[in-house]
Amino acid sequence: MTNLLNNWLIINQFGYDLPEPWQLGLQDAAHPVMEEIIFFHDQVMFILIIIITTVLWLIVKALSGKAYHRYLVDGTLLEIIWTIVPAIILILIAFPSLKLLYLMDEVMDPALTIKAIGHQWYWSYEYSDYQTETLEFDSYMVPTSELNKGDFRLLEVDNRLVVPINTHVRVLVTGADVLHSFAVPALAVKMDAIPGRLNQTGFFIKRPGIFYGQCSEICGANHSFMPIVIEAVSLDKYINWVLSGSDE
């Protein structure tokens, strides 16, 4: 219990966004689309609870009641009701779902473009929007034996993907060898990295923090050992990071 409490304090104090022990809900949203997804999830769960409660009540009432129609074989009004009501419920669920699908695919006028390339078993990133030479680096998982106090096992990397907050970021995703998947739950990002094909996704991070993800496509023996870490910082810190990276 002490370890769980310490992990919870570390996660909340330093702004880390990753799954928590015994977590039942979704991660805190840092991207407007993720906020919409959580809201839609809550709506669907509310509808589901109402349906389950109603059906259970009808079952209990039917089994416990003494009055029943032994020879009732049809009821036009009843059939109309149980056809129309589910149809309306499905429509109410479908329209917000379609809206979210389009929002997740739309990349709005990006101010920054990053290329993420999946390898067996690490990620490489390229920043090519600047007049200087392309800023590129590889990102490997930090082995358990080299973790520092407060680091997270199987989630830490040696080089984080650094982006500015309040900025539309586009990520071009591809694979160098086999299928991979670039996924960061807190940002509602999941895009397949396919060799020979360039896919795109985007996000708009609203607050500083460190956001953890992983490859979400089985890609070989070390599939579980290629995490993704995105560090969102202020624009000034991001510019300093770019300048320091360009000088190296």
Curated annotation (Swiss-Prot):
Positions contributing to Mg(2+) binding: E217
SUPFAM superfamilies: Cupredoxins, Cytochrome c oxidase subunit II-like, transmembrane region
Residues reported to bind Cu cation A2: C215, E217, C219, H223
A GO MF term: copper ion binding
Localisation: Mitochondrion inner membrane
Residue intervals on the Mitochondrial matrix side: 66-79
Membrane topology: Multi-pass membrane protein
TM ranges: 44-65, 80-99
Catalytic activity: 4 Fe(II)-[cytochrome c] + O2 + 8 H(+)(in) = 4 Fe(III)-[cytochrome c] + 2 H2O + 4 H(+)(out)
PROSITE patterns: COX2, COX2_CUA, COX2_TM
Pfam families associated with the record: COX2, COX2_TM
Binding annotation for Cu cation A1: H180, C215, C219, M226
Keywords from the UniProt entry: Copper, Electron transport, Magnesium, Membrane, Metal-binding, Mitochondrion, Mitochondrion inner membrane, Respiratory chain, Translocase, Transmembrane, Transmembrane helix, Transport
Record GO cellular component, one term: mitochondrial inner membrane
Biological process (GO), any one: ATP synthesis coupled electron transport
Enzyme Commission code: 7.1.1.9
Family membership noted in the UniProt record: Belongs to the cytochrome c oxidase subunit 2 family.
Subunit (UniProt): Component of the cytochrome c oxidase (complex IV, CIV), a multisubunit enzyme composed of a catalytic core of 3 subunits and several supernumerary subunits. The complex exists as a monomer or a dimer and forms supercomplexes (SCs) in the inner mitochondrial membrane with ubiquinol-cytochrome c oxidoreductase (cytochrome b-c1 complex, complex III, CIII).
Function field: Component of the cytochrome c oxidase, the last enzyme in the mitochondrial electron transport chain which drives oxidative phosphorylation. The respiratory chain contains 3 multisubunit complexes succinate dehydrogenase (complex II, CII), ubiquinol-cytochrome c oxidoreductase (cytochrome b-c1 complex, complex III, CIII) and cytochrome c oxidase (complex IV, CIV), that cooperate to transfer electrons derived from NADH and succinate to molecular oxygen, creating an electrochemical gradient over the inner membrane that drives transmembrane transport and the ATP synthase.
Protein name: Cytochrome c oxidase subunit 2
Provenance organism: Metridium senile (Brown sea anemone)
Gene that specifies this protein: COII
